[in-house]
């Protein structure tokens, strides 16, 4: 019956219907209905997302989806953001660009995260894709402003250039001048990560001649005195990153900035504010009533000035801020911003032992009580209680992402000195739609039992300095049906939990473990047992076979793949496929023979 229904629609109709299906997992499900749907979906797929660049080869993707216009790739594991992945590990995008340059000549969008991108890559992109429109490089490295100059000079239809949090070699600040004088298509520009000055005259000319520019995020080197000039050239902006927000207090600078901002009637998102001078903050008040996003994570502004600013932002939906906001500021946020969906509070002094601000669990409790739409939290603090976590869970059962980072590892409930198991247990029990969870504080295996029992929709879990034994990890792997990414550091989890749940790993995207109790022997056995997994031992102490098999490895990264072992492994990475484990065995036999 299903086959007859599938065949009753012309291909053109099905292609049109499929175009409304946006989620990759839904597109994948559609392609499994029957052979004809598989072929139609294959030829009409325009966007591809690959969460691990080593999970599949470029050739396989190109063969599977010949008409792709947009590619999104991720490289290094998430823990690379915390310097836990050694330099030179991999994540090189050049093989992908090289393969796509000859097969996807009409490619329009490339979005990369945590990948190594060289100037050669950027030059090849500029040369190969004639209708190229979007380049997003998020937390990438390896390229310079010379590569950006090639993009600017050649990609005449470029709409978006986003370098968010990338490490760029600033060879020259004049790369913006490579955009041709006839170029007018820019919609979004993010250069906030650049350390050096850019040519302001080139930037001003670019902004002036792009009437559709909606998002402009400047770097710290753009002085506050010149911001008003750019705003006057682009009053249509919807998103602004201010760059440096410091200057000698002068009435003419303040009034010029205030007038320019008041002319930006469409502005909805503000960020930047490096080294913000409080005296200039009231200049933004005229746009605050419309703001939905405010990123103050670089603004070292004290609570008093933050409170005055937040009182002007009743429509705020997303706030990123340093812990200078303190509990008092979060109470004002809770009473003012009833539409708040996302809150991130970052530490101003993460390596200072004594607290430098009055930020506690009470601030988060206040927001959970006052903001009924809150669904995403990242909260750095120095103390927490089970009672507070239980209250937050009951107040906000709609939470989908909850990441709590208590700065001191293994910190207990500071009032009772008990583990925080019950508190996090309440989070996973009450928040039925929880997708992402990060744990911290003193935690036993009990919390992982709660997670395995209740967190049925959780897709990503981050764990550090937690648990008692393999049982904790076993609870998670055996109980969390939707788990896709698990990252663990400094926990006593080892061989038993890993090997007992080997089949679960084939349903996940990846597992990262560092400074745990996983042995080299278990990694070898897992690699032999599960050929669809790449089991990569990362050990900078030397070849793991030079030590007893019972010796724990420094790091292991396990991920599902249809491409087999990768070919760009550095000298400190070993793949535990069957061939490599046989080579290790022969080496051990030879060594013992000597």
From Swiss-Prot:
UniProt superkingdom: Eukaryota
Metabolic or biological pathway, per its Swiss-Prot or TrEMBL entry: Protein modification; protein ubiquitination
Induction: Repressed by miR393a (microRNA) in response to flg-22 (flagellin-derived peptide 22).
MF terms (GO), sorted A to Z: auxin binding; auxin receptor activity; inositol hexakisphosphate binding; ubiquitin-protein transferase activity
Outcome of mutating residue 10 to A: Abolishes SCF(TIR1) complex formation, altered auxin-mediated response and reduced affinity for auxin
GO cellular component, as recorded: nucleus; SCF ubiquitin ligase complex
Site (Interaction with auxin-responsive proteins): 139, 165, 380, 489
SUPFAM superfamilies found in the cross-reference section: F-box domain (SSF81383), RNI-like (SSF52047)
Chief localization: nucleus
Keyword Cell cycle applies: yes
Gene3D superfamilies per UniProt: 1.20.1280.50, Ribonuclease Inhibitor
Annotated (indol-3-yl)acetate binding sites: 403, 438-439
Cellular compartments annotated: Nucleus
A Pfam family per the record: F-box_5
Tissue: Expressed in roots, stems, leaves and flowers. In adult plants, mostly expressed in floral stigma, anther filaments, abscission zones and vascular tissues.
Keyword Nucleus (UniProt): yes
Ligand binding (1D-myo-inositol hexakisphosphate): 74, 113-114, 344, 401-403, 436, 484-485, 509
Phenotype upon loss of function: Plant are deficient in a variety of auxin-regulated growth processes including lateral root formation, and hypocotyl and cell elongation.
Stored PANTHER family: F-BOX/TPR REPEAT PROTEIN POF3, PROTEIN TRANSPORT INHIBITOR RESPONSE 1
Note: The myo-inositol hexakisphosphate acts as a structural cofactor.
Subunit details: Interacts with auxin. Part of a SCF E3 ubiquitin ligase complex SCF(TIR1) composed of SKP1, CUL1, RBX1 and TIR1. SCF(TIR1) interacts with the COP9 signalosome (CSN) complex. Interacts with Aux/IAA proteins (IAA3, IAA7, IAA12 and IAA17) in an auxin-dependent manner. The interaction with IAA3, a negative regulator of auxin responses, is promoted by auxin, but repressed by juglon (5-hydroxy-1,4-naphthoquinone). Interactions with auxin-responsive proteins is inactivated by auxin antagonists.
Function field: Auxin receptor that mediates Aux/IAA proteins proteasomal degradation and auxin-regulated transcription. The SCF(TIR1) E3 ubiquitin ligase complex is involved in auxin-mediated signaling pathway that regulate root and hypocotyl growth, lateral root formation, cell elongation, and gravitropism. Appears to allow pericycle cells to overcome G2 arrest prior to lateral root development. Plays a role in ethylene signaling in roots. Confers sensitivity to the virulent bacterial pathogen P.syringae.
Recorded domain comment: The F-box is necessary for the interaction with SKP1.
Name of the protein in its database record: Protein TRANSPORT INHIBITOR RESPONSE 1
């Amino acid at each position: 019956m299903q086959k007859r229904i599938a065949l009753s629609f012309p291909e053109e109709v099905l292609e049109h219907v499929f175009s409304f299906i946006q989620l990759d997992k839904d597109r994948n499900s559609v392609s499994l209905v029957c052979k004809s749907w598989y072929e139609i979906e294959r030829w009409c797929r325009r966007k591809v997302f690959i969460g691990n660049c080593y999970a599949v080869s470029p050739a396989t993707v190109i063969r599977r989806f010949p008409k792709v216009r947009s590619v999104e790739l991720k490289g290094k594991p998430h823990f690379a953001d915390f310097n836990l992945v050694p330099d030179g590990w991999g994540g090189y995008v050049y093989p992908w660009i090289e393969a796509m340059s000859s097969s996807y000549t009409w490619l329009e969008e490339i979005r990369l995260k945590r990948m190594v991108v060289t100037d050669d890559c950027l030059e090849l992109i500029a040369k190969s894709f004639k209708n190229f429109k979007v380049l997003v490089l998020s937390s990438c490295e390896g390229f310079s402003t010379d590569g950006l100059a090639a993009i600017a000079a050649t990609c005449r239809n470029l709409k978006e250039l986003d370098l968010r949090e990338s490490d760029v070699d600033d060879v020259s600040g004049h790369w913006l001048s490579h955009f041709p004088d006839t170029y007018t298509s820019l919609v979004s520009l993010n250069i906030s990560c650049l350390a050096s000055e850019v040519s302001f005259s080139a930037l001003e000319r670019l902004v002036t001649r792009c009437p559709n520019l909606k998002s402009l995020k400047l770097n710290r080197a753009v002085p506050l005195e010149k911001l008003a000039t750019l705003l006057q050239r682009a009053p249509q902006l919807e998103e602004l990153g201010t760059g440096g927000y410091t200057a000698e207090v002068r009435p003419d600078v303040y009034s010029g900035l205030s007038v320019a901002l008041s002319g930006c009637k469409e502005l909805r998102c503000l960020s930047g504010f490096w080294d913000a001078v409080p005296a200039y903050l009231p200049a933004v008040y005229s746009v605050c009533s419309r703001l939905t996003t405010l990123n103050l994570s670089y603004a070292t502004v004290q609570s008093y000035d933050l409170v005055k600013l937040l009182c002007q932002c009743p429509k705020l939906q997303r706030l990123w801020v340093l812990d200078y906001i303190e509990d008092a500021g979060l109470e004002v946020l809770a009473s003012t911003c009833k539409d708040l969906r996302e809150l991130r509070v970052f530490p101003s002094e993460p390596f200072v032992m004594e607290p430098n601000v009055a930020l506690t669990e009470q601030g988060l409790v206040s927001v959970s009580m006052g903001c009924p739409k809150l669904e995403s939290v990242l909260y750095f603090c120095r103390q927490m209680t089970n009672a507070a976590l239980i209250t937050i869970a009951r107040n906000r059962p709609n939470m989908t992402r909850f990441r709590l980072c208590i700065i001191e590892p293994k910190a207990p409930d500071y009032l009772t000195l008990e583990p925080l198991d019950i508190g996090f247990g309440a989070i996973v029990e009450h928040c039925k739609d929880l997708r992402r969870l990060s744990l911290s504080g003193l935690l036993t295996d009990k919390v992982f039992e709660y997670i395995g029992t209740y967190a049925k929709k959780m897709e990503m879990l981050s764990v550090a300095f937690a648990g008692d034994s393999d049982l904790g990890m076993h609870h998670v792997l055996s109980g969390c049906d939707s788990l896709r990414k698990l990252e663990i550091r400094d926990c006593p989890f080892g061989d038993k939990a890993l090997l007992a749940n080997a089949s679960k790993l084939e349903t996940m995207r990846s597992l990262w473990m560092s400074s745990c109790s996983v042995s080299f022997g278990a990694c070898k056995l897992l690699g032999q047992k599960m050929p669809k997994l790449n089991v990569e031992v990362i050990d900078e102490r030397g070849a793991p076979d030079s030590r007893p098999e019972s010796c724990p490895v420094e790091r292991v990264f396990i991920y599902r793949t249809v491409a087999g072992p990768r070919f760009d492994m550095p000298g400190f990475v070993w793949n535990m496929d069957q061939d490599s484990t046989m080579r290790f065995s022969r080496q051990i036999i030879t060594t013992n023979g000597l």
